[in-house]
Amino acid sequence: MSRLYRIIPMRILRRTPGVKFDEMVPSDIPKIDGIDRVIHGANSISPGPIDDCTPPVQRPWYMHPGQDDNLMVLAGTRYIDIYEPKSKQKASFIVTPEKVYKNDKLYFDGPAMVVWPAGVFHRIISGEEGSISVNFSTRTKKFDLSNNFNIYDLCTETGDYKLLKDGSEDQPDLTYEYPNENIKSLFKS
């Protein structure tokens, strides 16, 4: 059976007035290939609705074929749905910096990392205050940035899914734009 998720608790290291200091036990630290800072505004939905398909899909899903997500919420609230298509397992989490709820019940009373493997569909809503998280990505041999953020329509009853949007369409062009050709030629020579 495929693994749907894992919770990695943080260990309380120290508490002083106004300061909470927690650590992850070294044996629990995942392999880290990338560190992603993700900031959501109030009531953000990720991925957002896809209206240019028939019918429009209000709550689509991401699925990373080559990346495990190791998500830690630092501020605000994240409402996370995950779904594994082979086993048809689904779980919903409400994650804050201090607690993790699973399917609306307190699951862990403390700071923790929520982990799901490559191939698991997921979608997120941030609370009224927005949210900030850090994702410590573990990338497999199948990792490819061009499809890592593809957006899907998913039927959680059958496990059937279809591509709605190529994730590469949202990737920015990171090429520097020189103010003029003179500067560019001087710089490149």
Which residues fall in each region the model found?
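Active-site region of the double-stranded beta-helix
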Residues: 1-108, 128-132, 136-189
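Histidine-centered metal-chelating micro-motifs
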Residues: 111-124
